[in-house]
A protein has these predicted regions:
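N-terminal (or domain-start) structured segment
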Residues: 1-61, 70-71
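Bilobed "Venus flytrap"/periplasmic-binding protein-like clamshell domains
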Residues: 1-21, 83, 87-154
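Short, solvent-exposed loop/turn and secondary-structure capping segments
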Residues: 8-10, 41, 63-65, 122-124, ...
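Alpha-to-beta junction loops
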Residues: 25, 45-54, 109-110, 153-162
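A generic structural signal for alpha->beta connector loops
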Residues: 26-28, 75-78, 107, 136-137
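Solvent-exposed coil/turn segments that connect beta secondary-structure elements
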Residues: 49, 56-59, 86, 94-97, ...
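Pocket-lining segment of extracytoplasmic ligand-binding domains
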Residues: 56-58, 67, 97, 134-173
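A structural signal for short loop-to-beta-strand junctions that line the ligand-binding cleft
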Residues: 70-84, 89
């Protein structure tokens, strides 16, 4: 994920741990900033990454070839190595936006997440359940996690959604 999320520092911590025993296994590890969960599992499937961090629901969809991974089909070679932390779906709204519930997002300026991110994937699932499309928002922005907090503070969006472990840097902003 992005540098202000939890995946990037988690990847860095894993790489530091791997570096301590590199003489034993010879594996080099580098943390990269990426588009997020969907991007990561697709990059692992394509052989562009050997290891990636992803939301468990995204892993499930990729493994079974359902929802956003239906067109690609199941990926039976995908493996879950370990779980890091829970990632609640979080909605942050401007106090003056009149948003008190998820339903209140309709008709507002909402950052739905960048394509390839777990937050976008989760938001699309929720939108489908609500019977919404992108057209139901006054603005459906596709900012990356690192950009959405500033957009909220600058009054460019009314709300942002984020599937992230807490504490998260961009929400602290």
């Amino acid at each position: 994920g992005g540098v202000t999320g939890v995946y990037y520092p988690t990847g860095g911590a894993i790489c530091r741990m791997m570096a301590r025993t590199r003489a034993d296994h010879g594996i080099r590890c580098g943390a990269e900033s990426t588009g997020g969960s969907v991007y990561n599992v697709n990059a692992v499937r394509a052989g562009e990454l050997e290891f990636g961090v992803a939301q468990s629901d995204v892993q499930f969809k990729a493994l079974n070839g359902v929802d956003s991974f239906k067109a690609q089909g199941a990926n039976p070679k995908l493996r879950s190595v370990f779980s890091i932390h829970p990632e609640p779906f979080t909605v942050v709204a401007r106090k003056d936006a009149g948003i008190k519930s998820f339903e209140d997002l309709k008709g507002k300026r909402v950052n739905v997440g960048n394509p390839g991110s777990g937050q976008r994937d989760t938001m699309e699932v929720l939108m489908k359940k609500m019977g919404w499309t992108m057209a139901d928002f006054a603005l459906a922005s596709e900012l990356q996690a690192a950009e959405q907090s500033q957009a909220l503070c600058d009054n460019n969006i009314d709300a942002m959604v984020y599937t992230v472990g807490h504490p998260a840097g961009s929400i602290k902003e």
